Regions:
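Sequence/structural signature of beta-propeller domains
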Residues: 19-236
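Fungal secretory targeting signals
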Residues: 1-20
């Protein structure tokens, strides 16, 4: 997976901190969405995941595409929450590789630093405690891949539209193996449901995919026909 020297520098809208700290300066921005008011007072916290941190499968950790926060609650002088982190499709500066798409789960702890100033800035006050990783698979349980889709045609399953796929030789990393054909995923956006399942937006399709809490694909929402890439009468 892609590794960053400084990863997951996070700016929190300070709605949580504002409940306990009175602000004397006007907010940077305010917006109302669906009847709920949100106020952004400035950078409230920052932290990082070590560049050499690895997940339970031995791959370096990235959460660069999207993040979702669940179970935000007060804890002492700070706050705790569960964070779902979505990596991109894997290292790809010289072409894509057969990286299995995944979602990382962290417990995060945020401790406000209301007295910090430009002259006396606070240190890192957002901690990431890695918990586990969910690998993403197709409806048949076969792992998905970060490889670019090819022109051999997509993969179809009962109740699903044809989805972009890649056929690769060997192990998909340039090494020996039996080869395979798998659904491709270039993960970009993430929304987590209350039951632990989650939606991911895919740039390859583009599709919207829903996965169960174990990472198995359960729903695929295909874009309108006018947006589908068609060549020779087939979706590519």
């Amino acid at each position: 997976m892609v590794s960053f020297k400084q990863l997951a520098v996070v700016a929190f809208a300070s709605t949580a901190a504002s409940k306990s700290v009175r602000r004397t300066t006007p907010p940077v921005a305010s917006v109302t969405c669906n009847g709920q008011a949100y106020t952004y007072d400035g950078l409230a916290g920052f932290g990082s995941v070590k560049s050499d941190a690895r997940d339970q499968y031995g791959d370096t950790i990235s959460i660069g595409s999207s993040m979702a926060i669940k179970d935000w609650k007060k804890a002492g002088k700070g706050y705790k929450a569960t964070m779902y982190g979505l990596p991109d499709r894997g290292w790809n500066t010289n072409g894509t590789q057969n990286t299995t798409p995944r979602v990382h789960i962290f417990e995060i702890t945020f401790t406000p630093a209301p007295d910090a100033t430009v002259a006396k800035p606070a240190g890192p006050n957002l901690e990431f405690n890695y918990k586990r990783t969910i690998l993403l698979s197709g409806p048949d349980g076969k792992p998905m891949t970060g490889l670019d889709p090819d022109f051999t045609g997509g993969l179809g399953y009962p109740g699903f539209p044809t989805m972009p796929a890649a056929t690769y030789p060997g192990d998909g990393f340039g090494g020996p193996g039996t080869g395979d054909k798998r659904i491709c995923l270039d993960a970009e956006g993430l929304v987590v449901d209350d039951d632990g399942s989650f939606w991911i937006s895919d740039e390859y399709g583009p599709f919207l995919y829903r996965f169960d809490k174990n990472g198995k694909l359960s729903t695929a929402v295909q874009p309108p026909d006018a947006l589908l890439p068609v060549r020779g009468g087939k979706v590519r």
